Amino acid sequence: MDIQQQAIGFLGGTFDPIHFGHLRPALEITEALSLQQLFIMPNHIAPHKSASHASARQRSEMVELAISHQARMTIDKRELKRHKPSYTIDTLKELKIEYPNTPICFIMGMDSLISFDKWFDWKSILSYCHLIISHRPGWQNKFNKQVGALVAKHQTTDKHDLHNIQFGKIYFQATSQLAISSTEIRTLLNQDISIDFLTPDSVINYIKEQHLYK
């Protein structure tokens, strides 16, 4: 099947700091699904998270450093400019106005999908985008009734649908699930333990220069 309109992807998160556990799956999804661009979107205030440990500017700059050599990855700063909690549905409405003819793929992990029915206005989200679910190989279905029904209705196994249909599909993509977390990195730094090979060197150097997470 020919691709009619190459989709774009969005990956949101606190990224405090960004690390290879974010970056490797993002790259794999971009390549596997032939996304024309993947936008890394740091949250300003995530409704379900406590205050971050680096400022919005610092988190943004770390993302830019981490993806500086990836031609198909860029940062989207819109949520950092908000002065209120950022909900996914609000961002998707903005994006659909900006990209009216381009399929939008919103990327999330399996843990987010499992609790998807707790998201603000969750039933409307698939009216603006496709959902790409990043998961480890061999995952098992643990959905509740509502999420299970949503998946049954909207799932596709044909990645061409993500380009040829504007919105409304759920696609599962196996990715490398690296056992790295931002919390772990902050804890190691607080204990003066090296974080080499957990995040790009450019991010490590920035953390040192800014004296973050101490």
UniProtKB/Swiss-Prot annotation:
Lineage, broadest ranks: Bacteria, Pseudomonadati, Pseudomonadota, Gammaproteobacteria, Alteromonadales
> Which GO MF terms does the UniProt record name?
ATP binding; nicotinate-nucleotide adenylyltransferase activity
NCBIfam families membership: cyt_tran_rel, nicotinate (nicotinamide) nucleotide adenylyltransferase, PRK00071.1-1, PRK00071.1-3
Supply the enzyme class, top level. Answer: transferase
Q: Which domain of life is it from?
A: Bacteria
Q: Pathway membership of this protein?
A: Cofactor biosynthesis; NAD(+) biosynthesis; deamido-NAD(+) from nicotinate D-ribonucleotide: step 1/1
Task: Summarize the protein's role.
Answer: Catalyzes the reversible adenylation of nicotinate mononucleotide (NaMN) to nicotinic acid adenine dinucleotide (NaAD).
Q: Disulphide bridges in this chain?
A: none
Task: List the catalysed reactions.
Answer: nicotinate beta-D-ribonucleotide + ATP + H(+) = deamido-NAD(+) + diphosphate
Q: Which SUPFAM superfamilies match?
A: Nucleotidylyl transferase (SSF52374)
Family, similarity comment? Belongs to the NadD family.
Write out the entry's keywords from A to Z.
ATP-binding, NAD, Nucleotide-binding, Nucleotidyltransferase, Pyridine nucleotide biosynthesis, Transferase
EC number(s): the record gives 2.7.7.18
GO biological process: any one? NAD biosynthetic process
Kindly provide the name given to this protein in its UniProt entry. Probable nicotinate-nucleotide adenylyltransferase
| InterPro entries xrefs | Cyt_trans-like, NadD/NMNAT, Rossmann-like_a/b/a_fold
**Organism of this sequence:** Psychromonas ingrahamii (strain DSM 17664 / CCUG 51855 / 37)
